């Protein structure tokens, strides 16, 4: 989260499921319940909202460091298995479009993929 905060990241794109079957594919690095907080040293992350937006789950996260807070959007695409590629590329194109829309709507931010 320090890298996200220090580099003014406003959009995170995650392209894998957290779990496939019994295997962990990625650590869950965000709070799971709305209003829940995760504290990592000097940074607090709070889940503000969680909804389905086209091919992705869209999470709004508030990152606080001291008195400064920022909003980060995570677009979590779960249609890409670790052993294959998406059957329909249109979902990936829609995801890229949603990422670009989010970057434009929030100003001078950076995307982390």
From Swiss-Prot:
It is an enzyme of class 3 (hydrolase). InterPro entries: Prot-tyrosine_phosphatase-like, Protein-Tyr_Phosphatase, PTP_cat. Its EC number is 3.1.3.48. Keywords: Hydrolase, Protein phosphatase. Transmembrane segments: none annotated. It holds the Pfam family Y_phosphatase. It catalyses: O-phospho-L-tyrosyl-[protein] + H2O = L-tyrosyl-[protein] + phosphate. Signal peptide: none annotated. One of its GO terms (molecular function) is protein tyrosine phosphatase activity. It comes from the Eukaryota. Residues 1-113 form the Tyrosine-protein phosphatase domain. Belongs to the protein-tyrosine phosphatase family. PANTHER family: RECEPTOR-TYPE TYROSINE-PROTEIN PHOSPHATASE, TYROSINE-PROTEIN PHOSPHATASE 1. This is Tyrosine-protein phosphatase 15. The lineage of its organism: Eukaryota, Metazoa, Chordata, Tunicata, Ascidiacea. The gene is STY-15.
């Amino acid at each position: 989260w320090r890298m996200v905060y220090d580099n003014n990241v406003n959009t995170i794109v995650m392209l894998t499921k957290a779990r496939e079957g019994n295997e962990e594919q990625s650590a869950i690095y965000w709070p799971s319940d709305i209003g829940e907080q995760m504290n990592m040293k000097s940074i607090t992350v709070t889940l503000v909202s969680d909804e389905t937006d086209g091919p992705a789950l869209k999470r709004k996260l508030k990152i606080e460091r001291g008195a400064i807070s920022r909003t980060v959007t995570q677009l979590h695409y779960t249609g890409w298995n670790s052993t294959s590629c998406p059957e329909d590329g249109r979902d990936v194109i829609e995801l890229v479009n949603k990422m670009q829309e989010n970057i434009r709507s929030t100003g001078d931010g950076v995307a982390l993929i």
